[in-house]
Amino acid sequence: PSKGYIANENFDLLKQAKYYVDNGISAFSILTEEEYFKGDNEFIKIIRENFPNIPILRKDFIYTPFQVAHTKFLGASAILLIVRMLDDKTLHHLHSLAQDLELDVLVEVHDEEDLKRALKIPKLDILGINNRNLDTFEVDISNTKKLIDKIPYSLKEILTIVSESGFLTKKDLE
């Protein structure tokens, strides 16, 4: 999305979703933010109806309890919380609320300061390390390794860590 719209006016949501399913995806990541990313809450409902057994991450700027509850109502399985967007009290509250609603929570960090804050969240279990610099929009996939090295070993053993952004080809993942 930082390089323009992902889809054009001919975008067929179900056709694209089926392509992903046929190629073995483990979960959908659905943009619902409308203004900047042209997402739509209806995308989650459509995907849930057609692929009821595949987890769905709602990608949006989540900053209120209502949005967390609405995510559950829409049929998503998980939310994204961007550490940089939230003060610690709100971050912890939304994380706890989501877990109470049986939603998984992908907590996204971009740098060492974000990471320090994220690691203080009680019951943190999924950590996303975004390789995109939010100030310059440049991508450096080595950011994941740099930040993983800052995580205590005892936490690495229990966290699911997701490397986000900057992967264009299979070779990038290797």
Language-model features: locations:
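Glycine-rich beta-to-alpha active-site loop
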Residues: 60-63, 73
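A short, acidic, amphipathic alpha-helical segment used as a generic capping/interface helix at domain edges
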Residues: 144-151, 168-174
